[in-house]
Amino acid sequence: MNRKHLPFIFALLLCLSPWVSSPTALVLGFLLASTGLVPSQLPISTYTKKLLSYSIIGLGFGIQFQQAIAVTSDGIGLIVVTIAGTLLLGFLVAKVIKLETTTAYLISAGTAICGGSAIAAVAPAIKAKDQQIALALATVFVLNSLALFIFPVIGHALALDQQTFGTWAAIAIHDTSSVVGAASAYGEQALTTATTLKLARALWIIPVALLSAILFARGNGEEGKRKLVLPYFIFWYCAAIAFSDLFPQFESVYQGIFSVAKQALVVCLFLIGCSISVEKLKSAGAKPLIFGLSLWVVISTTSLSWLLLTR
């Protein structure tokens, strides 16, 4: 490295601090890549995939399995339908607009489950490239930012009660951070409902990632045999959830691990941002954003309509 790469080192260290959010980290990496300040000799892709796996495992310690299942028993049906419906709709829309399959699937997974965390979990399972991950994350983050402001306004305009708004936010907003932000702005009960449902929704990272590995099994060797690459970190993610539930006396330790994992994920997003530039975005076109927006509008309107009809 030389002096030219000092901004990269500084930005990386900054992402280790609690002052940089995930969207900011992604933007920082993107800006450095666009200005040629990312060291070309670093195997960033390798570092990113390993750190992503470790981060997802650590996040498992922050999910209270039994509590999430118990509290969300009434809403589990809607969660399953919306997840399956979003993935299916994403497949169909991608075919119509001819969007590259892997990028479309990542955006669909992020929309269906829990935004950036779902994308981060599914990406290694389907061997997604950094550019594909970055495009999916960028799309989700843009829509997340809009949701943070739009959802409370719509909720008040329609006079939604606290539970209805909390349920809607948990289903229709991608990332947990934006769900919590929008729900807290609406009310305390909405916040409780939204947070619990969103955590239960996050549990679906496990089966979706495993299913993704099967669907995206690649051909291997000259004979063209199918090779299944199992995302073993998902099993460790599941083990982390189970362990923290079986041994609750170490809650303070789990919270520490969870906090470190969240910060590591911020670093991952910075590294992913370093893999994409203005030139690459231009070559991708507007299709990813159009695709993500289409899915988001459909899932938001249909879930809200169902909640209004059944309340």
UniProtKB/Swiss-Prot annotation:
It holds the Pfam family Cons_hypoth698. The keyword Transmembrane applies. InterPro entries: UPF0324_pro. It comes from the Bacteria. The keyword Transport does not apply. It is found in: Cell membrane. Belongs to the UPF0324 family. This is UPF0324 membrane protein VV1_3166.
